[in-house]
Amino acid sequence: MFVVLASLFMACGTPKDGYVVKGSLKNAGDGYAVISVADHTGASVIADTAEMSGGKFRFEGKTPFVAACSLRVVPEGKEVLDMLIVLENSPIKLQGDWANLERNTGGSFFIRDMKVTGGKNTEVCNLLDEVYFSTRRLPEFKDYERLEKWFASLDENAELTDEVMRKADTLQEIEDRFRELVFGKQLEIMAAHPSSEAAALYLTPMIDGMKLDEFERVFGLFDEAVRNSEMLTDIREELETRQRLAPGRIAPVFSLAQRDGQMLSLA
C-alpha cells in the first residue's frame, strides 16, 4: 500500500482525475506540511512534503484508492498541528485561523471552527464529526469537558479518595451516555452512505463494544467494494478473527506436513 501511494504522491503534474489538497490557514505564517501514511507494520512513513508560505500549502497527485492519511502542519516557531484526512481523487480544501488553535484534553492541538471541504468521503466525515460536536453542546454534557480536564490533571499516584471515585464514576456515566448518543446517530449516517469508505472507517471506535452479530450486520450494510477496501483492512481482519473464534462456528481447515510427506488435516 505505502509503495503505491508514495509513488503516486510524488508524481509530477496534476492528474485530471486526481486530488489537489489546498491549505489556507490564516496567521500560520511560513513552514511546511507533511502527508504521512502507515506502512505494513503500522509505522508512520512520510509520503509527501509541501512548503507553506503565508499559511498556504498545496499537495497534488493521484491515489489508486481512498486512504486515511495523517496531515501535519509545522509553522516556523509555532505549535504543530496533526490531523487525519481522508484522501480521495477530488479537490480538498482546508481553511482555518491559527489564532483559533486550541489543545484538547488529550494534549493534541486542533483549530476551532476549521472548515474542510472535498469529495464524497470528506463530506461524510463532516457529517459524522458534526454529530460529535453537536452532542457535546447538549446541556446534559455541560460538565463533560470540566471532568475530562480534571481527570487528565490527576497524578498517577493520586489518592483514591471518596471524592475522586465519585467524580470518576460520574465521568464514566457521562462518557457512556455520550458514546451511546453519538454512535447511534453516526450509525444512521453510515447506513445512509453504504458506498463511503470514510463512513465505514468510523466504525473503528465502536467495534470493541459490539457483539459479533451486530458487528456483522453493521459492516454488512456497506457495499462489497467498501468492505474490501485497503483502508478498512484492520476492521475486516478484526471481524474475520472474531468469526473464527466464535463458539459454534465451523473452524478453518489446517494442513500440516508429516515426516513421511503425508498431509495431516486438522479442522
Give, region by region, the residue ranges found by the protein language model.
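Sec-dependent bacterial lipoprotein signal peptides
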Residues: 1-10
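Short, functional N-terminal and low-complexity linear motifs
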Residues: 2, 36-40, 152-155, 167-169, ...
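Short intrinsically disordered, low-complexity segments
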Residues: 10-11, 255
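A non-transmembrane, solvent-exposed segment enriched in polar/low-complexity residues
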Residues: 12-174
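N-terminal targeting signals for export/organelle localization
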Residues: 80, 93-95, 101-104, 179-246
